[in-house]
């Protein structure tokens, strides 16, 4: 259902801070032409935390419109209030999205029981396939494998995006949840190793600027051609690392603009445009990876 290279798509904005739908269409077409396996619209890389509900919904619907059935679209639906996450999930119930990606509630630090009840409420509100998203470095809460296993009992909770970079969790989660439960890496630098150890793919920041390479790498991995995949991975490693030189999505937003993929590098406060000191770092990463000549 979900595998390969899925891009955590940036949300292009104009100089007034409004969504730039012309650039969005260009990004969607770029990923379709590059062979990207799926698009996450309005995930955390897409600045979900600083968009209004109306903007959020319109962005997902426009992404669906622009994709026109040519690529699976996953809607970001996470929130730190359960009722809000439920509302998003209901809004996309009949939209045509392939699934919903819901980050763990951030800042309020729920217990494992709170996380279970949060996702249970979401699951019971919709029949759309749900992807859990664990990124404790950003949320200050860790969705443990034992809790994932409880949630995997719900028919429409089908996958986990794991951004912990703790590769030992793959086997633990597979043992608890079974082989059919989908595990996706949320950490580009360790994503290929994640797949070697039994994962199914990646939800990627790097794919924003190196879509064809990422799609090729994970297609090779799916065929067991890990040596060939590793050659690509090593070339892309500067991006995997330096696209996080400052808080995501600041570097990747600047990088997509530097490559001419979006019209403006603007980003919403409290995030700011990539600092002048970090811009050469990202530019050199683009050059070393072979995506900027």
UniProtKB/Swiss-Prot annotation:
Identify the GO cellular component terms for this protein. cytosol
Q: What is its EC number?
A: 4.3.3.7
Task: Write out the GO MF terms.
Answer: 4-hydroxy-tetrahydrodipicolinate synthase activity
Q: Which residues form a coiled coil?
A: none
Recorded hits in Pfam families, A to Z, give:
DHDPS
Q: What is its main location?
A: cytoplasm
Instruction: Indicate the family of this protein.
Output: Belongs to the DapA family.
Q: How does it assemble?
A: Homotetramer; dimer of dimers.
Free-text function comment from the UniProt entry: Catalyzes the condensation of (S)-aspartate-beta-semialdehyde [(S)-ASA] and pyruvate to 4-hydroxy-tetrahydrodipicolinate (HTPA).
The protein, known as: 4-hydroxy-tetrahydrodipicolinate synthase
The protein's organism comes out as Aliivibrio salmonicida (strain LFI1238) (Vibrio salmonicida (strain LFI1238))
């Amino acid at each position: 259902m979900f595998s390969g290279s899925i891009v955590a798509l940036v949300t292009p904005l104009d100089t007034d801070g409004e969504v730039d739908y012309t650039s969005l269409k260009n990004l969607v077409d770029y990923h379709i032409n590059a062979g990207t396996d799926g698009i996450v619209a309005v995930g955390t890389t897409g600045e979900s935390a600083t968009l209004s509900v109306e903007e959020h919904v319109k962005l997902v619907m426009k992404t669906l419109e622009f994709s026109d059935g040519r690529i699976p679209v996953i809607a970001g639906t996470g929130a730190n209030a359960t009722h809000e996450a439920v509302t998003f999930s209901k809004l996309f119930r009949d939209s045509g999205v392939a699934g919903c990606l819901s980050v763990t509630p951030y800042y309020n630090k729920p217990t494992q029981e709170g996380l279970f009840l949060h996702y249970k409420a979401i699951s019971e509100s919709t029949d759309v396939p749900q992807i859990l998203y664990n990124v404790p470095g950003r949320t200050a809460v860790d969705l443990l494998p034992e809790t994932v296993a409880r949630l995997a009992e719900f028919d429409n909770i089908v996958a986990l995006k794991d951004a912990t970079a703790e590769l030992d969790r793959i086997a633990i989660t597979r043992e608890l949840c079974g082989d059919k439960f989908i595990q996706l890496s949320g950490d580009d630098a360790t994503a290929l190793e994640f797949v070697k150890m039994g994962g199914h793919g990646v939800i990627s920041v790097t794919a924003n600027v190196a879509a064809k390479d990422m799609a090729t790498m994970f297609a090779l991995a799916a065929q067991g051609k890990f040596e060939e995949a590793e050659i690509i991975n090593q070339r892309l490693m500067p991006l995997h690392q330096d696209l996080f030189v400052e808080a995501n999505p600041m570097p990747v937003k600047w990088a997509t603009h530097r490559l001419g993929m979006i019209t403006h590098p603007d980003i919403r406060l409290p995030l700011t445009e990539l600092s002048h000191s970090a811009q050469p770092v990202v530019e050199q990463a683009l050059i070393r990876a072979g995506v900027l000549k």
